[in-house]
Amino acid sequence: MLPELGFLSLLFATTAALLLSIVPQIGIWRNKPTLTNTAWGLSYCFGIFTSVSIGILAYSFATDDFTLEYVAAHSNSQLPTFFKVAATWGGHEGSILFWLFTLSLWLVAFAFFSRKNDRTFSAQTLSLLGLICLGFAIFILFYSNPFGRTFPAPAEGRDLNPMLQDIGLIFHPPLLYVGYVGFAVNFAMSISALIFNRSAQAIARAMRAWVLVSWLFLTLGIVLGAWWAYYELGWGGWWFWDPVENASLMAWLLGLALLHSLMVTEKQGAFNYWTTLFSLLAFAFSVLGTFIVRSGALTSVHAFALDSSRGYVLLLIFFLLTVGSLSLFALRTNSNESAVKFPLISKTGAILGLNIVLTVATVSTFLGTFYPMLFQAMSWGSISVGAPYFNSIFLPLLTLVLFAMAATLCLSWFKTDKKRFFKRLLLLIPAAVIAYGMIWNALQNDGALRFHFFAYVLLTLAIWVLFVTLWQNWVKVKLAYFGMILAHCGVAITTMGAVMSSYFGSELGVRLAPQQSQQLGQFEFHYDRFSNEIGPNFTAEVAFFSVSEQGKPYAEIVPERRYYDVRTMTMSEVGLDAGFWGDLYIVMGDNLGKGEFTFRLHYKPLIRWLWLGGILMALGALCSAINLKRKRDE
């Protein structure tokens, strides 16, 4: 009975979305406030019905209701309860319903916070959000219904994919979805501004708060995903240039460009075109990311759906959103933009340069991600575009981004003090010395490493950004700029962690039997013993290592190989000793008999700085959003 109630709630939600997309529009264009004001009540109704639907699905997982085909395919009675609940969004149908639920949260939030604003504009925005909700609700009803029954019910479920049985994967998709879907708000606001022929400056401050929160969650989702890839997939890296990773990166880059563009638009009335365009594309690329994950069109470790027909529907939604919004943008832009002149060598000019670089990075990522699919669709054969392409593009672009970031702090909005600018420029000298010292120390610890010029340049610029950011605000930190300080420091720290761990880490593949040792740089790994253990829904082979540094005990590390009976899958669980200055990392490979295994030993310097920098970026966005709310309340 409960699953039927969940499906019925989904039908009611679809009806509410349909009414929301039509009734307020009638009120707006016929000047009938009573009909216009229905936007708020219908938004709350949609949120309630969607919440009931996702809640019933989660309850079905928690109670092992294997009469639901979706539950039977993605859960098991032996699965720990928190993984059962997380399995709600572990497959295609549940993830799309969760996507819709997240969209309903943003819809309700906008309805709540806009109730005292311009009623006509807010109702138009809510109605557009309702139209987006309607599209995805119809998609779920006809192509991705998670409430389908199966009779007779299987005695046991197929279990959740072992790759997803991890604490990181409980929070990673929700954070990404909140970030992705949040861009729908600024998308709808921009469309409303185009419909009412308003400039982006008129809504810049209101839009900026929504973008900050969306970008905050997207940043946390990406950071958590990179952390999961690092410790769960067992390949020693944190970014694979996987199509799904690229999709989140493209949305993140566009969101970052939008934030900087909004700042200029609000302050000077410039960049109206940029602001509107970025706000439209950020959400369109979020939908594109959903298509990549759930269509199976591109090979990805994240793509768990292989039904291409559902992918075509998502692609159609992406096409309608993109073409429709860009067509309206093209029709309306001539009357929106007023010429605002500014010196090229200024803070505004530096932000313009930053936005151009971020746009090039997004386009380059898009081409690298979809070129293999186009190549195959045209029957030209198959081709793979991997890390060499993306690294060759992003290394010089990241160099420009870091320089532009520092320049925005060194320059003024209109007239720049040259003496002040060159003082900041001189900070490059100590930055270069420190960067060289960090690399020299890494080379001394492992003679197999080599000097990388580009890595040195990036490290120098990252330290320079850190110096300039702190120097600029050391004497008097204004609350208005505190978020910016945290975010810029976060970018610098993340870059330092990425460069040091990627270029100056140590790695070695070995085969070891118990009581054998292996040296890696300044560390000695001693394989103490081996045992077999039984988990709640798996069996495991466990190796115990003790690590010493120059003869002194340093760490105890325990890698595993787990076998999941129901899914008949073997997964490596890395052994990890996490430290502020670096991680020791062991991946357990094939069993060679009598306790002998193959292992991969890693040392990753400053890898933790990646996560620290990401958290600082998110905190920076949070502080900026709080500051905007404080200004609004004053």
PLM segments and residue spans:
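A conserved hydrophobic secondary-structure block that centers on an alpha-helix together
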Residues: 11-22, 95-150, 154-226, 234
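Membrane-interface interhelical loops and short amphipathic "cap" helices
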Residues: 1-9, 32-36, 59-93, 145-173, ...
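Contiguous transmembrane helix-bundle modules in multi-pass membrane proteins
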Residues: 1-33, 50-52, 66, 243-251, ...
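Transmembrane-helix bundle segments that line or gate the permeation/cavity pathway
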Residues: 50-72, 77, 86-111, 141-148, ...
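Extended, highly charged clamp/arch subdomains and adjacent linkers
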Residues: 2-85, 93-108, 115-122, 135-146
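Membrane-interfacial loop-to-helix junctions in multi-pass inner-membrane proteins
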Residues: 29-50, 109-133, 195-216, 241, ...
